[in-house]
Curated annotation (Swiss-Prot):
Name of the protein: Elongation factor Ts
Free-text function comment from the UniProt entry: Associates with the EF-Tu.GDP complex and induces the exchange of GDP to GTP. It remains bound to the aminoacyl-tRNA.EF-Tu.GTP complex up to the GTP hydrolysis stage on the ribosome.
Chief location bin: cytoplasm
Keyword Cell inner membrane: no
Region listing for Involved in Mg(2+) ion dislocation from EF-Tu, in residue ranges: 80-83
The keyword rRNA processing is annotated on this UniProt entry: no
The organism of origin for this protein: Verminephrobacter eiseniae (strain EF01-2)
UniProt similarity note: Belongs to the EF-Ts family.
Length: 308
């Protein structure tokens, strides 16, 4: 089994907000598997273990470009936060978003093949990317993009350079902008419950079932009454219902007025949201977590060895 290091415990705590000892126990039980340990914590501690899942550590920027009813949202990644603030890197990201909006490329490869020159590099976007890698000395990747061109109005919201939202709508632009800000804050995964991916619902049901099974085993061990299968089933479905309410945009309480749902706010304003895209830099990506203490210790040991 892999040794459980302090940096692993810290990483898991950063992802889950769980107590340090619980993180260590989960990692030990999972044999050092970070994903499995996170799942174990969700079962043991409930939904609060997933609240910090959006604390993404990969670097880069999100950029957008809107031109009338055409627009684009794109994520461009770098290795360090320092490079993500580099002017040439930022220019590349903004240019890539504009190229997507103008040309509607089929994929990243098609985007890279589009004509573009910057900083003496070209004649394609991919050539510029490779040139900047050599110039700056750090890898950078055009990770993903979303094109909008269905003929609806568009509005965007950028929270710094790490969170970006584009909303397709018909109606009041001010309300649509507020909804874009809401999406950045609340991070829904779909417009309505019907649009939530089946695999996410299945995963949530699995976590709720595992939590119920653990509670049953604990009750039996302690000699307490065990919930009936009917109650357990209702409990599991209740957890799924709550999850759908939490992650479907229309069901969410509006951030600027939690007495109303987003759906109610839109209806009152005569506005409809047709779709949206939300990008968070590094979402779903792994990033190397350096054990700084171990690194320093290794450097000290190497220095001592050099002296002797």
């Amino acid at each position: 089994m892999a040794a459980i290091t302090a940096s692993m415990v810290a990483e898991l705590r950063g992802k889950t907000d769980a107590p340090m000892m619980e993180c260590k126990k989960a990692l030990t039980e999972a044999g050092g598997d970070m994903a499995k340990a996170e799942e174990l914590l969700r079962i043991k501690l409930g939904t609060k273990a997933g609240k910090a899942a959006a604390r993404i550590t990969a670097e880069g920027v999100v950029a957008c470009h809107i031109d009338g009813t055409r627009g684009a949202l794109i994520e461009v990644n770098s290795e360090t936060d320092f490079v993500s603030k580099n002017d040439s890197f930022l220019q590349l990201a903004r240019a890539a978003a504009e190229l997507v909006a103008r040309h509607q490329p089929a994929d990243i490869a098609a985007l890279g093949a589009l004509a573009y020159e910057q900083d003496g590099f070209g004649p394609t976007l991919e050539d510029v990317r490779k040139g900047l890698i050599g110039k700056i000395g750090e890898n950078m990747v055009l990770r993903r993009f979303r094109y909008f061109g269905a003929g609806h109005r568009l509005v965007s919201y950028l929270h710094g350079t790490r969170i970006g939202v584009v909303v397709e709508f018909d109606g009041d632009a001010t309300v649509a902008k507020d909804v874009a800000m809401h999406i950045a804050a609340m991070k829904p995964v779909a417009l309505s419950s019907a649009g939530v991916p089946a695999e996410l619902i299945a995963a949530e049901r699995s976590v709720a079932a595992a939590k119920a099974a653990e509670d049953k085993a604990r009750a039996e061990a302690e000699g307490r009454p065990v919930q009936s299968d009917d109650i357990v089933a209702k409990r599991i479905e209740g957890a799924v219902h709550k999850y759908l309410k939490d992650v479907a945009l229309f069901n969410q309480a509006f951030v600027k007025n939690d007495k109303q749902t987003v759906e109610q706010v839109l209806k009152a304003a005569g506005t409809t949201v047709k779709g949206f895209a939300l990008y968070v830099v590094g979402e779903g990506m792994e990033k190397k977590v350096d054990d700084f203490a171990a690194e320093v210790a290794a450097q000290v040991a190497a220095a001592k060895a050099a002296v002797t």
